[in-house]
Amino acid sequence: MRVLVQRVSSAAVTVEGAVVGALRPDSQGLLALVGVTHSDDRDKARRLAEKLWKLRILADERSASDVGAPILVVSQFTLYADTAKGRRPSWNAAAPAAIAEPLVTEFAAALQGLGADVQTGVFGANMQVELVNDGPVTVLLEL
C-alpha cells in the first residue's frame, strides 16, 4: 500500500461536475492519494492510517492529530505504475477493484476512527482533483 501525501491549504474532488469531497478553504490539511497492491490487507490500511494521522509534516512540525487537520482521501491506482519498459505504464502491480476498494474504504474509516475529519473521492470514478500544495510538502508513505 502506498499513500502519496501532500500538505495542502485547500483541496477538492469533483465527479461529473459535482464536488464530492473538499477541505475547507485556507485550512491546513492533507491530501492522501492511496494506491493498493495485491498483497495489501486491512492491517496495512489501519497502520498506514495511523502513520499518516501522526506524521509531523504540518507547520511547526505538527501532525494532523495535533491540530485536527482535515484529510481528503482519494484512490489512486496509478501509484503502482511500472514504467521500467517502453513508453506505456503497466498497471499489473495495482490491485483490482475488488481488493482495492475495501482497503481504501478501510484506510479512510481508520482515519475517522482516530478522530480525523475525512472527506473522500469516489472509487473508480473519473475524478478531477484540485489542490493548493502548501510548501510544497509531498511525502510517499509505504508499508
Swiss-Prot record:
Motif (Gly-cisPro motif, important for rejection of L-amino acids): 135-136
Keywords: Cytoplasm, Hydrolase, RNA-binding, tRNA-binding
Function: An aminoacyl-tRNA editing enzyme that deacylates mischarged D-aminoacyl-tRNAs. Also deacylates mischarged glycyl-tRNA(Ala), protecting cells against glycine mischarging by AlaRS. Acts via tRNA-based rather than protein-based catalysis; rejects L-amino acids rather than detecting D-amino acids in the active site. By recycling D-aminoacyl-tRNA to D-amino acids and free tRNA molecules, this enzyme counteracts the toxicity associated with the formation of D-aminoacyl-tRNA entities in vivo and helps enforce protein L-homochirality.
Protein name: D-aminoacyl-tRNA deacylase
GO BP of this protein: D-amino acid catabolic process
Main location as per UniProt: cytoplasm
InterPro entries: Daa-tRNA_deacyls_DTD, DTD-like_sf
Catalytic reaction equation(s): glycyl-tRNA(Ala) + H2O = tRNA(Ala) + glycine + H(+); a D-aminoacyl-tRNA + H2O = a tRNA + a D-alpha-amino acid + H(+)
Top-level taxonomic group: Bacteria
PANTHER family the record matches: D-AMINOACYL-TRNA DEACYLASE 1, D-TYROSYL-TRNA TYR DEACYLASE
Compartment(s) of residence: Cytoplasm
Matching SUPFAM superfamilies: DTD-like
Family of the protein in this entry: Belongs to the DTD family.
GO cellular component, one term: cytoplasm
GO molecular function term, any single one: Gly-tRNA(Ala) deacylase activity
Domain notes per entry: A Gly-cisPro motif from one monomer fits into the active site of the other monomer to allow specific chiral rejection of L-amino acids.
Encoding gene per record: dtd
Key word Hydrolase present: yes
